[in-house]
Curated annotation (Swiss-Prot):
Source organism: Neisseria meningitidis serogroup B (strain ATCC BAA-335 / MC58)
Membrane topology annotation: Single-pass membrane protein
Protein name per the record: Probable peptidoglycan D,D-transpeptidase PenA
Subcellular location(s) of the protein: Cell inner membrane
Enzyme Commission no: 3.4.16.4
């Protein structure tokens, strides 16, 4: 029997389907294709670099050279007290080659032209370039700018230009002995260039650069070796170019006129000890020092010792007055006399002279008798105090200390001869400095080549009253009856002293070789300028200090007073001599 059921199966609800992200077959294909193309491009580029441009890139890489170039510090400028430039450094270029990198030598025509431009023989150039192991060899230093441009136009490979600085001396011979010169690397060799080297030089810098074969800088590279240069210090000297010019010209005229071996002049500021002028002849051009010999380069005013002759007498007279060993009224017997077997005499015999007469007539007898009133040790100490036998520390290299033998070794006659300038030696600059003890009211001043901002401290040698008395006595030397009338300057009272010394040659005093000296100051009451002149071995028109060194002294003193704007201290004569402005 068939039974019908009322049951109906119950339908379960449909599960909600989670939508999965759809991945596009097209997009996948695109990405894969892009990657494939990229790799294919890289492979192709690699093949291209290896096959097509390898030689080109290799050549470009070979053409790039990393170098560390010096950045030269600019050397300090040297100028006179008024700003006239005496030494300066200007940019220049130097040429070097890199033989190690050269694939082939320059052509014969290129070498010939290069030889003409740099003034180096072709054979020398070829020998330099054939040194294949070298990566640096100088061809020519410090080329003229026009020449450098012409060399660049040759297009030579592995020839490189290096920036440098070249020293120039605009005044040429005029300041040669004071300034000196540098070598080609800019290092001081003589004069103030040497003594002030540390101040003038500064500190070079460095820069790492990339150069091409022609030496052109392609790029500057960052490097811990890079350093900026520190320029040198500018120096202002005490010298006055106007006075220096005057002194140099008058000195040369005198040396030529008297057919002398050499000459020297020193001009000091009598109040400060500053050197206003210092000149020697013969001289040289510091721009071409290699053409000068040792005689031309020698700064005689500082390095050469001379016996001062009678120019030392004012100090002996001053010492006697200062110590109360004499006075202006005393008359001394000035007849010739002997010390042991050695005679002491004057050029002209005077029976007796007072102190003024001893100064005016330049009496050896009178001066030696004043010196004899002191012990040898006391006179030795006195000369030493004046700076004889002592370095001045002027700042100039090679300065002499002079010569003063120990008093214990003096023979009886030597104390006498020293009183009139024989047996002791000093430089002309030392002698001029000693005169500051008279011009600065008894105080010995230091000398300086650099301009002084503050008045220097000196050392007292005499009482102020003594210095003034001696200055007054020295005016008589340039007045009628004195030995130095040739040095008189119109409109001024000039205090001066002449000196004539026979030269010591081969162990004896020569009869025909002399040093003529004239030294003095003006105005006498309030001195502003000291001038000292020596003419070495005059052979024509006389040899006495007053005759030979007096005329250039007169011109230099008169001109210096005029240049400095110092007014005359007494009426001018009708025949007043015109002095340079």
């Amino acid at each position: 029997m068939l039974i019908k059921s009322e049951y109906k199966p119950r339908m379960l609800p449909k599960e909600e389907q989670v939508k999965k992200p759809m991945t596009s077959n097209g997009r996948i294909s695109f990405v894969l294709m892009a990657i494939a193309v990229l790799f294919a491009g890289l492979i192709a580029r690699g093949l291209y670099l290896q096959t097509v441009t390898y030689n080109f890139l290799k050549e470009q890489g070979d053409n790039r050279i990393v170098r560390t170039q010096t950045l030269p510090a600019t050397r300090g400028t040297v100028s006179d007290r008024n700003g006239a430039v005496l030494a300066l450094s200007a940019p220049t270029e130097s040429l070097f080659a890199v033989p190690k990198e050269m694939k082939e030598m320059p052509s014969a025509a290129q070498l010939e032209r290069l030889s003409e431009l740099v003034d180096v023989p072709v054979d020398v150039l070829r020998n330099k370039l054939e040194q294949k192991g070298k990566s640096f060899i100088w061809i020519k230093r410090q080329l003229d700018p026009k020449v450098a441009e012409e060399v660049k136009a040759l297009g030579l490979e592995n020839f490189v230009f290096e920036k440098e600085l070249k020293r120039h001396y605009p005044m040429g011979n005029l300041f040669a002995h004071v300034i000196g010169f540098t070598d080609i690397d800019g290092k001081g060799q003589e004069g103030l260039e040497l003594s002030l080297e540390d101040s003038l030089h500064g500190e070079d810098g460095a820069e790492v650069v990339l150069r091409d074969r022609q030496g052109n800088i392609v790029d500057s590279l960052d490097s811990p070796r890079n350093k900026a240069p520190k320029n040198g210090k500018d120096i202002i000297l005490s010298l006055d170019q106007r006075i220096q010019t005057l002194a140099y010209e008058e000195l040369n005229k005198a040396v030529e006129y008297h057919q002398a071996k050499a000459g020297t002049v020193v001009v000091l500021d009598a109040r400060t000890g500053e050197i206003l002028a210092l000149a020697n002849t013969p001289a040289y051009d510091p721009n071409r020092p290699g053409r000068a010999d040792s005689e031309q380069r020698r700064n005689r005013a500082v390095t050469d010792m001379i016996e001062p002759g009678s120019a030392i007498k004012p100090f002996v007279i001053a010492k006697a007055l200062d110590a109360g060993k004499t006075d202006l009224n005393e008359r001394l017997n000035t007849q010739p006399y002997k010390i042991g077997p050695s005679p002491v005499r004057d050029t002209h015999v005077y029976p007796s002279l007072d102190v003024r007469g001893i100064m005016q007539k330049s009496s050896n007898v009178g001066t030696s008798k004043l010196s004899a009133r002191f012990g040898a040790e006391e006179m030795y100490d006195f000369y030493h105090e004046l700076g004889i036998g002592v370095r001045m520390h002027s700042g100039f290299p090679g300065e002499t200390a002079g010569l003063l033998r120990n008093w214990r070794r003096w023979r009886p006659i030597e104390q006498a001869t020293m009183s009139f300038g024989y047996g002791l030696q000093l430089s002309l600059l030392q002698l001029a400095r000693a005169y500051t003890a008279l011009t600065h009211d008894g105080v010995l001043l230091p000398v300086s080549f650099e301009k002084q901002a503050v008045a220097p401290q000196g050392k007292r040698i005499f009482k102020e009253s003594t210095a003034r008395e001696v200055r007054n006595l020295m005016v008589s030397v340039t007045e009628p009856g004195g030995t130095g009338t040739a040095g008189a300057v119109d409109g001024f009272d000039v205090g001066a002293k002449t000196g004539t010394a026979r030269k010591f040659v081969n162990g004896r005093y020569a009869d025909n070789k002399h040093i003529a000296t004239f030294i003095g100051f003006a105005p006498a009451k309030n001195p502003r300028v000291i001038v000292a002149v020596t003419i070495d071995e005059p052979t024509a028109h006389g040899y006495y200090g007053g005759v030979v060194a007096g005329p250039p002294f007169k011109k230099i003193m008169g001109g210096s007073l005029n240049i400095l704007g110092i007014s005359p201290t007494k009426p001018l004569t009708a025949a007043a001599v015109k002095t340079p402005s």
